[in-house]
Swiss-Prot record:
Enzyme Commission number(s) of this protein: 2.7.1.68
Gene Ontology annotations of biological process type: phosphatidylinositol metabolic process
Domain of life: Eukaryota
Presence of the UniProt keyword NADP in the record: no
Region (Disordered), start-end ranges: 266-289
Record's protein name: Phosphatidylinositol 4-phosphate 5-kinase 8
Annotated stretches, region: Activation loop: 725-746
Entry-linked InterPro entries: MORN (IPR003409), PIno-4-P-5_kinase_pln (IPR017163), PInositol-4-P-4/5-kinase_C_sf (IPR027483), PInositol-4-P-4/5-kinase_core (IPR002498), PInositol-4-P-5-kinase_N (IPR027484), PInositol-4/5-P-5/4-kinase (IPR023610)
GO molecular function, one term: ATP binding
C-alpha cells in the first residue's frame, strides 16, 4: 500500500502531520501531544522507528535511533539540567557504549548495562580526580586505577565502589603501600615503602590496569564516543510483535512522559572517594621523607583501617626475603603446582565437575530413605565411562576420556540433606559456569585443593590410604554426625575417583568450607598441641599463610557458656577419633579482628554522598585525626532474633544457636557495628577477646604490637581426621623419640594425642579469672 501525506487531529488533542499507510503513520511524520511533547522523524506502520527527534516541554531532547516505539540504537539525550548522554540505547535504557557529561562537569565514558555503568569505563571528576577500570551495577567493581588531583594514586581491586582486595597506593611524594583493603579500609598485612626506598616492580600493575610505566593513563577505545562511528556497529535488535492501532499512539508505553529524562538516570547511591586520609598519611607518607642510602621499610598489619602491628626493616632485608603478599591477583585466588601441571590439571577439574553433575543427577530422583548397611559396602558405587565424544549416558565434553567412580552415594546424599544442602544448589556451587578455583595447600601433604566459586565447598585430593580410612570409618562417622549436630569435625559431602586414560587414579573428597563467611579472616592457625617443628619462619609468613602452634601469640577469653559448649563438643569429637585410633588431626582456627565501632567515623573513606548531590560519583577529601591508642568495643552480643540475622549459615553448620551467660543464658546473635548481625553457633561467629601474650614477639625482630586486647570473631573446626595410628606412625614415633621429647612430637598414641590436644586448647581458651 502506498503512503500519502496527511494531517490528523485526534479527539484527545494529539496532532499528526506526515505520511500515512492506510490509517497508520508510515514514513516521515511529526506527532504532537497536548502536554507539549513533540516527535519528528521516521515511522513504521504506526510505530516510532528509525531516526528521529523527541522533545519534551521541560527542555529535554533526544535525537537518534528508535525501534518499535522505544529509544533503541544510538542517540543523544540532553537533560534540562544540562547533562548529556551520547551512546547506545536498548528499550529506553542506556545499554552499550556511551558517554555522559554531567551537569557538574563530571564525565563517564564507557560501557553501560540496563541504565547503569557496567563493564570497562573511565570516570573523570570536575576536581581532577579520575578512575579507569571495571564497573558493575553503577559502582566501581573489579580491577581499576584511581588517581587524585593531589598526585596520589591507587591501583588495585574494587567492590561496590570501595577499595577491596589487593592493591598498591602511591603517594604524591613517592612512597608506596602494597597491601589489602576491605570495604574501603586497609585490612590485613601490607608493606609501606617510603620515598627513595627500593620497592617491587610496578610494570605488571601498570600493564594490567591500562596505563604506561610512567603512570600516565592510556585511554581505551571507548574513551571518546563518536556517534557516527557507533552507528556502524551492529545494533541490538528485539522482536516487536505487538500490533498497533491508530489509537495506540497515545498509550503511555510509547509517548515518553515529560519526566522520562530524570527517571532513567542512575540511582544516587555512589560513594565518595578521597585520597588517603590525613591520619593515614601521617603514618605512611610522613615517613616518606626518609631518604638515606638504606631507608627503612615498614611491614604493617591493619584491622578495618586501624594499624595494630608494625615491623621495621631495611629495604635491603626486604629485597632478600620472600614476598609476603601475592599482590598481582585478587586476594581470594592463589595458584599451586600440581603433579599433573598445566592443561592436565584443567582437565582434571572439568572431569570432576562432569562426574559430580552425573552422580547427583542420578541419585537425587531416588526416593528418600534411611541408610542401610549395604549403602556402606564395596558394592555401593556408581561407575561410568565418560568418552570425549559422549555416549548414550554421558554428554560430549572438552576434556579427555576418563572413568568415574562415586563412593557410597546414598550415604553422602543423606549427609547433604542432613545439612539442608539442596541438590541443585550443590551442583551449581561446584559445577556451575564459574567453575572451581585452585588454592594453595596449607600443609605438607602435597594435596591439590579446589574452592567452589561461592566459597561454600573445599575439594581435596586424597591418598589411597586416606580413602581407605574414610570408607572404613564412614558408618561410625555417619552415626556421630547424626547424633551430635554441633560436631566440629570436618563435614564430608562426597567421595569420588577419576581414572585418567594413562591409568593414573585421582581421589577426591568434597568438604564444607569452615571459613565460608563474608568477614575477612585475618589470621589462620593449624593447632595440634605438639611443639616439634610447629612454627613458621617469619620471612615465609604472608597474607594467606596458615600459622602453627608456636606462632600463636594470643589466648582467647570467651563467655562462660560459649566456652563450656565448645569444650563439651571438643571432648566428644576427640573421644570419637580416639576410638577409631586416629591422630594427627588439628584445630583449624580462623580469626576476624574487629576494629571498635567509634573509630568508624574517624577512619579512612568511604563517606556517603549527601542527598543534594547529583547522580555523578562524588569525590571529597576527608580530614581524619590520628588513631586512638585504646580501642573501644568492636562487637556486641544480643538476644537471638531469627528474622534479624543477615547471613545464612555455611554448609558446614547444622547446630542450634548458642546461649551466652552474659545475656541471661539466652540464645544470642552477634552484632558487628556497620557490618552485620550474625547467628552464634559452635565454631561459627563465636565472639571472644584475644589477649596478646606479652613477650611473645622477639624484640630483635623490630615488631611492635600496638594493642594488647582485641575483639575477635572466631571460626574453627577439626580437620585432617584420616590418619590412623598404623605401623608407619609407630615407627615414626620410635625414631623421633630417640631425638626429641616424645610428648613434643606429633606421632604419639591416640589416647595421649587426644589428651594433649585438649589440654593445649584449654590453655588457648582459658577460663576467665
Amino acid at each position: 500500500m502506498e503512503t500519502r501525506p496527511a494531517e490528523r487531529v485526534f479527539s484527545n488533542g494529539d496532532v499528526y502531520s506526515g505520511q500515512l499507510k492506510g490509517t497508520l503513520p508510515h514514513g516521515k511524520g511529526k506527532y504532537a501531544w497536548p502536554d507539549g511533547i513533540i516527535y519528528e522523524g521516521d515511522w513504521e506502520e504506526g510505530k516510532i522507528s528509525g531516526r528521529g527527534k523527541l522533545m519534551w516541554s521541560s527542555g529535554a531532547k533526544y535525537e537518534g535511533d528508535f525501534s518499535g516505539g522505544y529509544l533503541h540504537g544510538f542517540g543523544t539525550l540532553t537533560s534540562p539540567d544540562g547533562s548529556v548522554y551520547a551512546g547506545a540505547w536498548r528499550m529506553n535504557v542506556r545499554h552499550g557504549l556511551g558517554r555522559k557529561e554531567y551537569c557538574n562537569s563530571d564525565v563517564y565514558d564507557g560501557s553501560w548495562r540496563e541504565g547503569l555503568q557496567d563493564g570497562s569505563g573511565s570516570y573523570s571528576w570536575y576536581n581532577g580526580n579520575r578512575f579507569i577500570g571495571n564497573w558493575k551495577k553503577g559502582k566501581m567493581s573489579g580491577r581499576g586505577v584511581m588517581s587524585w588531583a593531589n598526585g596520589d594514586l591507587f591501583n588495585g581491586f574494587w567492590l561496590n565502589g570501595l577499595r577491596h582486595g589487593s592493591g598498591v597506593y602511591k603517594y604524591a611524594d613517592g612512597g608506596f603501600y602494597f597491601g589489602t583493603w576491605s570495604r574501603g579500609l586497609k585490612d590485613g598485612s601490607g608493606v609501606f615503602y617510603p620515598a627513595g626506598s627500593k620497592h617491587p616492580s610496578l610494570k605488571k600493575w601498570h600493564r594490567h590496569f591500562g596505563y604506561d610505566d610512567t603512570g600516565n593513563f592510556l585511554l581505551s577505545h571507548n574513551s571518546t564516543i563518536n556517534i557516527d562511528d557507533l552507528r556502524t556497529s551492529k545494533a541490538v535488535s528485539r522482536s516487536l510483535s505487538e500490533l498497533t492501532t491508530t489509537s495506540g499512539l497515545t498509550r503511555t508505553s510509547e509517548r515518553y512522559p515529560d519526566d522520562y529524562w530524570s527517571t532513567s538516570d542512575p540511582p544516587r547511591d555512589f560513594m565518595h572517594h578521597g585520597p588517603s586520609s590525613k591520619s593515614a598519611r601521617s603514618v605512611d607518607s610522613g615517613q616518606s621523607e626518609i631518604r638515606d642510602k638504606n631507608p627503612i621499610v615498614f611491614e604493617r598489619e591493619y584491622m578495618q583501617g586501624v594499624l595494630i602491628k608494625e615491623r621495621i626493616m631495611s629495604s635491603i632485608d626486604m629485597s632478600h626475603r620472600a614476598r609476603p603478599l601475592n599482590l598481582t591477583k585478587e586476594v581470594t585466588v592463589s595458584a599451586c603446582v600440581s603433579f599433573l601441571g598445566g592443561k592436565w590439571n584443567h582437565y582434571l577439574m572439568l572431569n570432576l565437575q562432569l562426574g559430580i553433575r552425573y552422580t547427583v543427577g542420578k541419585i537425587t530422583p531416588v526416593p528418600p530413605r534411611e541408610v542401610r548397611a549395604s549403602d556402606f559396602s564395596e558394592r555401593a558405587r556408581i561407575m561410568m565411562f565418560f568418552p570425549r565424544n559422549g555416549s548414550q549416558y554421558t554428554p560430549p565434553h572438552k576434556s579427555i576420556d576418563f572413568d568415574w567412580k562415586d563412593y557410597c552415594p546414598m550415604v553422602f546424599r543423606n549427609l547433604r540433606e542432613m545439612f539442608k544442602l539442596d541438590a541443585a544448589d550443590y551442583m551449581m556451587s561446584i559445577c556451575g559456569d564459574d567453575g572451581l578455583r585452585e588454592i594453595s595447600s596449607p600443609g605438607k601433604s602435597g594435596s591439590i585443593f579446589y574452592l567452589s566459586h561461592d566459597d561454600r565447598f573445599v575439594i581435596k585430593t586424597l591418598k589411597r590410604s586416606e580413602l581407605k580410612v574414610l570408607l572404613r570409618m564412614l558408618p561410625r562417622y555417619y552415626e556421630h554426625v547424626g547424633d551430635y549436630e554441633n560436631t566440629l569435625i570436618t563435614k564430608f559431602f562426597g567421595v569420588h575417583r577419576i581414572k585418567l586414560k594413562w591409568g593414573k587414579k585421582v581421589r577426591f573428597v568434597v568438604m564444607g568450607n569452615m571459613f565460608c563467611t563474608e568477614l575477612k579472616i585475618h589470621r589462620r592457625y593449624d593447632l595440634k598441641g605438639s611443639t616439634q617443628g610447629r612454627y613458621t619462619e617469619k620471612n615465609k609468613i604472608g597474607e594467606k599463610t596458615t600459622l602453627k602452634d608456636l606462632d600463636l601469640a594470643y589466648e582467647f577469653h570467651m563467655d562462660k557458656l560459649l566456652r563450656e559448649a565448645l569444650f563439651k563438643q571438643i571432648i566428644l569429637d576427640c573421644s570419637f577419633l580416639e576410638s577409631l585410633q586416629i591422630l594427627d588431626y588439628s584445630l583449624l582456627l580462623g580469626l576476624h579482628f574487629r576494629a571498635p565501632d567509634p573509630l568508624t567515623d574517624i577512619l579512612e573513606p568511604p563517606n556517603e554522598m549527601s542527598d543534594q548531590e547529583s547522580d555523578s560519583v562524588g569525590s571529597v577529601d576527608v580530614n581524619l585525626p590520628r588513631e586512638p591508642s585504646i580501642p573501644p568495643k568492636g562487637l556486641l552480643m544480643v538476644t537471638h532474633e531469627p528474622n534479624s540475622v543477615n547471613t545464612a549459615p555455611g554448609p558446614h553448620i547444622r547446630g542450634s544457636t548458642l546461649r551466652a551467660f552474659s545475656v541471661g543464658e539466652k540464645e544470642v546473635d552477634l552484632i558487628l557495628p556497620g557490618t552485620a548481625r550474625l547467628r552464634v553457633q559452635l565454631g561459627v561467629n563465636m565472639p571472644a577477646q584475644a589477649h596478646h601474650k606479652l613477650g611473645q614477639d622477639n624484640e630483635e625482630s623490630g615488631t611492635v604490637e600496638l594493642f594488647e586486647v582485641y575483639d575477635v570473631v572466631v571460626y574453627m573446626g577439626i580437620i585432617d581426621i584420616l590418619q590412623e595410628y598404623n605401623m608407619k606412625k609407630k615407627v615414626e614415633h620410635t625414631c623421633k623419640s630417640m631425638k626429641y621429647d616424645p610428648m613434643t612430637i606429633s606421632a604419639i598414641e591416640p589416647t595421649l594425642y587426644s589428651k594433649r590436644f585438649i589440654d593445649f586448647l584449654l590453655k588457648v581458651f582459658p577460663e576467665k579469672a
